[in-house]
Structure formats: structure tokens, C-alpha cells
């Protein structure tokens, strides 16, 4: 990866950490999930408003490291307006990217900013926490999601 690309990716992560998108509660959410990463201390909640099979709105709140917060912010942008199946597909491609099992070619530049995370296994949990919570919420599961035992 070129130095310019690394700088761009770092800038994207820092910007979404400082000014996260969709950092709010959806009062009339049809689904909600809580996520916890005990290793890093990340704690967040994800709200989803489904309209039939479509993610009409998605938001999050919580605290965590820059990677966790930026990933949650970008996740909300990536899945809003998508069908459940499309959102799950984006989840799968993002997880493949951060675990080094995919190149993220189909993901936008924002999500590809997390491509270097695969080199730091503990940070994979930070990057994927909001995604696991979102997947749990759209599946209608109510139990908290933990990164313990997951990638």
C-alpha cells in the first residue's frame, strides 16, 4: 500500500472517529443490539429501523477506540437503504477485509480504510464490533453481542 493511500485511510478513520455519522438513538427503532469488546473496552449500541426487508435507518451510540467508532460510523452509511441480504453481504465482505481473507474490492474507499486492521488481530474485534451488532439487530436477536470468541 502506498504512503498516500495509508494517509488517506488514516484520515478517513480519524475523521469518522471525531465526527461520527448517525451517532444518535432511533426512537422508533424496530431492532436494537448492544455490543461489547472486553479486550479494548468498546461498548456500543446499534439501532435499526426496518421497512419491510430494507434497512430504512441505522444508528449507533457508545464509546470506544477510534477504529471501533469509525467502523460503526461507516457501517451505518454502508447499510442504510440496503436490503437485509445486501447488508449481510456487505458485513461478510467487510469481515473478510479486516481478517485478511478478502481485498474489499467491492467496498467503497471508506470501508477499505480498514484493510490494514488484519495485521493487528486485537483490532479486528474493534473494527467488527458494530457490524456484529448490526447483523444481530437485523436478524431480530436481542442478546448482547461480544467479540469474545469471534473475529
Q: Which residues fall in each region the model found?
A:
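Secondary-structure capping and boundary motifs in well-ordered enzyme cores
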Residues: 40, 67, 119-123
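Alpha-helical support elements that line or immediately flank enzyme active sites
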Residues: 71-83
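Contiguous, function-dense segments enriched for cysteine-driven chemistry
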Residues: 38-49, 54, 66, 96-99, ...
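Short, thiol/selenol-centered motifs that function as redox-active sites or metal-ligating centers
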Residues: 62-69
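Alpha-helical macromolecular-interaction surfaces
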Residues: 69-70, 89
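Structured beta-strand/loop patches that form or line metal/cofactor-binding pockets in enzymes
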Residues: 19-62
Amino acid at each position: 500500500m502506498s504512503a498516500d493511500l495509508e494517509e488517506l485511510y488514516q484520515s478517513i478513520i480519524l475523521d469518522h472517529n471525531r465526527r461520527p455519522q448517525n451517532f444518535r438513538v432511533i426512537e422508533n427503532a424496530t431492532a436494537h443490539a448492544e455490543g461489547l469488546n472486553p479486550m479494548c473496552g468498546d461498548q456500543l449500541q446499534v439501532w435499526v429501523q426496518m421497512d419491510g426487508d430494507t434497512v430504512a435507518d441505522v444508528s449507533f451510540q457508545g464509546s470506544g477506540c477510534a477504529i471501533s467508532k469509525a467502523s460503526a460510523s461507516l457501517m451505518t452509511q454502508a447499510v442504510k437503504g440496503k436490503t437485509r441480504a445486501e447488508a449481510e453481504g456487505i458485513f461478510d465482505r467487510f469481515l473478510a477485509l479486516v481478517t485478511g481473507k478478502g481485498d474489499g474490492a467491492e467496498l467503497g474507499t471508506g470501508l477499505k480504510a480498514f484493510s490494514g486492521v488484519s495485521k493487528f488481530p486485537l483490532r479486528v474485534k474493534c473494527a467488527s464490533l458494530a457490524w456484529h451488532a448490526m447483523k444481530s439487530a437485523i436478524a431480530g436477536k436481542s442478546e448482547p453481542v461480544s467479540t469474545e470468541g469471534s473475529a
